[in-house]
Amino acid sequence: MAEKMFAHQLSERGLADVVRVTSAGTGSWHTGDPAHQHTAHVLREHGYPTFHRASHVDDDHMAADMVVAMGRNHMRILRQLGVPPAQLRMMRSFDPRSAAHPLDVEDPYYGTVDDYEETYAVINASLPGLHDWVDEQLAARGIAS
């Protein structure tokens, strides 16, 4: 969900050719599967694209300028896989209100559409901070955003 939201927002800003956004799971059990039906529903309701095929984290993902984890367990696994600490952040750490909430973005997989809407809201609150981070990185490289 976060990948589709952020990539779409970057595209609307004209940055799709400058910033690459990918998504991958730390487990391989859903590799190749489409987005969960509730994820697709929520994304569609909010005007985002829904096409997705799940992938497993690989060297390409781990070499990104920033790897964003949704939960502490993902963070631990990504550290064990070798993602440098300076390149690893929790999604909610980009939300200015995150100090008032747990940093985990709850996985709604076994939940209702309402649970997916709640996850959407949590991600949506974090994305402005992630945009700010991208803008800072681009500015440091002399690229206008």
Identify the function of each model-found stretch:
Residues 1-145:
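Short polar/charged helix/loop
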